[in-house]
């Protein structure tokens, strides 16, 4: 009887953990003082705020003031190669995404289904997708700004 009771407690603990680990809404993540709330990642002094990662003097460099992030330092890897990325399921994203460096995309990008997006995107750099001289070295490839 003692072994059965102990096994029963372990099974109940696993069931309780399974029940309470399910994500039912974004309420806990996007709460007032959560990740994107008052004092979280998106706050005025957080990662995406006025003094954080995305700030003019943050990790994204001084690009807004005419000084690119990797102009005189070590630049990012060129990314010449081939790879496949497949994503299935829902991708709920809330907050700010800052990408510093190179994001090479060669080939086709296809979305199936509804893609709801709001906000703005600005891309500045060199094109490695066939416009210009391939963008494989310093000064090659036509610069662009969207």
UniProtKB/Swiss-Prot annotation:
It holds the Pfam family Chorion_1. Residues 1-21 form the signal peptide. Keywords: Repeat, Signal. GO terms for molecular function: structural constituent of egg chorion. GO terms for biological process: chorion-containing eggshell formation. InterPro entries: Chorion (IPR002635). The keyword Secreted does not apply. GO terms for cellular component: egg chorion. This protein is one of many from the eggshell of the gypsy moth. Belongs to the chorion protein family. This is Chorion class A protein Ld3/Ld29. It comes from Lymantria dispar (Gypsy moth).
């Amino acid at each position: 009887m003692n072994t059965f009771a102990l096994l029963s407690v372990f099974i109940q603990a696993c069931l309780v953990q399974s029940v309470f680990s399910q994500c039912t809404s974004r309420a806990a993540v996007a709460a007032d003082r959560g990740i994107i709330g008052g004092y979280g990642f998106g706050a005025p002094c957080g990662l995406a705020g006025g003094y954080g990662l995305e700030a003019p003097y943050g990790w994204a460099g001084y690009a807004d003031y005419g000084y690119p992030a990797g102009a005189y330092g070590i630049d990012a890897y060129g990314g010449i190669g081939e790879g496949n990325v497949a994503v299935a399921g829902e991708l709920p994203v809330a907050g700010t995404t800052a990408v510093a460096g190179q994001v090479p995309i060669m080939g086709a990008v296809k979305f199936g289904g509804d893609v709801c997006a709001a906000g703005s995107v600005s891309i500045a750099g060199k094109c490695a997708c066939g416009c210009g001289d391939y963008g494989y070295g310093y000064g090659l490839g036509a610069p662009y700004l969207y």
